[in-house]
């Protein structure tokens, strides 16, 4: 039984160590240790309703702290990986610079390996222009589709076209052409299947 109180003292010392750490050095294990210490101290205060409400708030704060620590750890790991990749790239460039002809490029220049299948094929400005044009065309298509739907449902009257014909007549004419094409297709398929109409 004496072993148990000694263990609690050791836990308390470890947990206080987690509280003494810099926020940037915290790990999720440290957050769990802090949570354990705070929970143990709240239990010692008793079962007052105010303590219970405070306990729920502390749990929420600990969850937020855990999330922040996890995100920070991920960001640090990503930066380490990027640093390692850059070191490898610099080392490769140094070896290539020693073995091949030295090319001195400015800070805004980039060397592109034409044999690399993942090389950039467009500038960022070209991509932006293409995306803007695509978005513009999408919005125009949506407007035309809405207008067509309104004409079909009868919400909008047909407009006069410059040739003096109404658009509805033009739409009907296109519909008739479609029907003729469909009947031709039906005849073709019925002929192939052995049915003659």
Curated annotation (Swiss-Prot):
InterPro entries per record: DZIP_RILPL (IPR051241), RH1 (IPR034743), RH2 (IPR034744), RILP_dimer (IPR021563)
Effect of residue 61 to E: Abolishes homodimerization
A GO cellular component annotation in the UniProt record: membrane
RH2 domain: residues covered: 119-184
Biased composition (Acidic residues): 8-17
GO biological process, one term: epithelial cell morphogenesis
SUPFAM superfamilies: RILP dimerisation region (SSF161256)
Coiled-coil annotated spans: 69-153
Pfam families: RH1, RILP
Keywords: Cell projection, Cilium, Coiled coil, Cytoplasm, Cytoskeleton, Protein transport, Transport
GO function terms (MF aspect): identical protein binding; protein dimerization activity
All residue ranges annotated as the RH1 domain in the record: 14-96
Major subcellular location class: cytoplasm
Sequence similarity: Belongs to the RILPL family.
Subunit structure: Homodimer. Interacts with RAC1. Interacts (via N-terminus) with MYO5A, the interaction is required for its role in dendrite formation. Interacts with RAB8A; interaction is dependent on the phosphorylation of RAB8A on 'Thr-72'. Interacts with RAB10 and RAB12; interaction is dependent on the phosphorylation of 'Thr-73' on RAB10 and 'Ser-105' on RAB12.
Function: Involved in cell shape and neuronal morphogenesis, positively regulating the establishment and maintenance of dendritic spines. Plays a role in cellular protein transport, including protein transport away from primary cilia. May function via activation of RAC1 and PAK1.
Protein name per the record: RILP-like protein 2
Gene expressing this chain: Rilpl2
């Amino acid at each position: 039984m004496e072993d148990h109180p000694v263990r609690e003292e050791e836990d308390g010392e470890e947990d206080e160590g987690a509280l003494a750490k810099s926020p940037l050095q915290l790990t999720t294990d440290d957050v769990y240790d802090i949570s354990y210490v705070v929970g143990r101290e709240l239990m010692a205060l008793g079962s007052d309703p105010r303590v219970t409400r405070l306990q729920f708030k502390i749990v929420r704060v600990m969850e937020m702290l855990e999330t922040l620590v996890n995100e920070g750890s991920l960001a640090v790991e990503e930066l380490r990986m990027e640093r390692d990749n850059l070191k490898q790239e610099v080392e490769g460039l140094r070896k290539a610079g020693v073995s091949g002809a030295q090319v001195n490029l400015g800070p805004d220049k980039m060397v592109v390996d034409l044999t690399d299948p993942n090389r950039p094929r467009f500038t960022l400005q070209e991509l932006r222009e293409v995306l803007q044009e695509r978005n513009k065309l999408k919005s125009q298509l949506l407007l035309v589709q809405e207008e067509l739907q309104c004409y079909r449902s009868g919400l909008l009257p047909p407009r006069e076209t410059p040739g003096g014909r109404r658009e509805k007549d033009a739409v009907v004419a296109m519909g008739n052409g479609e029907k003729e094409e469909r009947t031709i297709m039906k005849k073709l398929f019925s002929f192939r299947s052995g049915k003659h109409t």
